[in-house]
Amino acid sequence: MSSLHIFSDVLALSIAAFSALCVQAHLTKRFTPTFSKNLEEKLPQHNKAVFWWLGISDNALRYVFVSLNILVSVSLALADLRTTGLKVSMGLLFIGFYSDMKLGESPIPHLILCSVVGAAIVAR
């Protein structure tokens, strides 16, 4: 295993851990109160800006995000699915970036995560 592959695995596992943290933040405020509050406040805006065509409630969208974050965490944690998980992560981050741009919010968090995922993909 090359050092680039190990580097990619470390980045992928870091993204998996962050995705698991996002699941926790969507479900409870106990460990990440500020992050949870931010997600809770921004979710309705993102629902109206990007996901209006789904016609689902904010609460349902929250569980869609939780499910997607679980999918990403599991796929990045499993070595056989890691490449696919990175590609799915990149696609979801592009949607988040688009949503930020549409709402006039700072795209920096999604750009940083896109850079990390992109580096992991290139290093594979």
UniProtKB/Swiss-Prot annotation:
Pathway: Mycotoxin biosynthesis. The chain crosses the membrane at residues 61-81, 103-123. Residues 1-25 form the signal peptide. It is found in: Membrane. This is Probbale cyclic ether formation enzyme scpZ. Its main location: membrane. Keywords: Isomerase, Membrane, Signal, Transmembrane, Transmembrane helix, Virulence. One of its GO terms (molecular function) is isomerase activity. The lineage of its organism: Eukaryota, Fungi, Dikarya, Ascomycota, Pezizomycotina. It is a multi-pass membrane protein. One of its GO terms (cellular component) is membrane. The keyword Transferase does not apply. Belongs to the cyclic ether formation enzyme xenC family. It comes from the Eukaryota. Probbale cyclic ether formation enzyme; part of the gene scp cluster that mediates the biosynthesis of a hirsutellone-like compound that has still to be identified. The keyword Transmembrane applies. Its EC number is 5.-.-.-.
